[in-house]
């Protein structure tokens, strides 16, 4: 397990605080966080359509358009009508921080609290908005810094990076070769 010593952690935290924009540090609503995460899940580094967001969040398209204006004012997205929405670096950092917390919470619920695989997502959806970055990092420490959640999805690192996982097509594997899916 790779752990950061306290001195390096303090330096990293100081640097990160300077690096983060005011929008990154501000407290935002659960709804704003849900939109940022949905945009990231739909499009990652590309553009997401208003209709795809409406479907993902189970809301009406006009509601999406209204929220996109707010997100753009906050500096979280770049939105061009009829061309979709893209996260800014600030929006992407916020979305990945939320996604990291969500996936770590799912892992914790399954491994330590006896939740079933089918139950963890909904519970994590509620909890992800209430936990701090400090809590998330302590949770990662407790869990041994897992790289994937119970559903097999990769857990972003503290800096928003993803674990390096090989993507070998099944057709390229040897007959009888053992692998983990």
Features from the language model and the residues they span:
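Mid-protein regulatory/catalytic core that forms ligand/cofactor-binding pockets
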Residues: 8-17, 128-181
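Short alpha-helical segments that sit at the start of domains
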Residues: 15-34, 172
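N-terminal helix-turn-helix DNA-binding core of bacterial DNA-binding proteins
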Residues: 26-59
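Alpha-helical residues within the helix-turn-helix
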Residues: 55, 72-73
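Key DNA-contact positions within bacterial/archaeal DNA-binding proteins
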Residues: 62
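A short, conserved structural fragment
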Residues: 73-80
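Basic, amphipathic "hinge/linker" alpha-helix immediately C-terminal to the N-terminal HTH DNA-binding motif
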Residues: 83-102
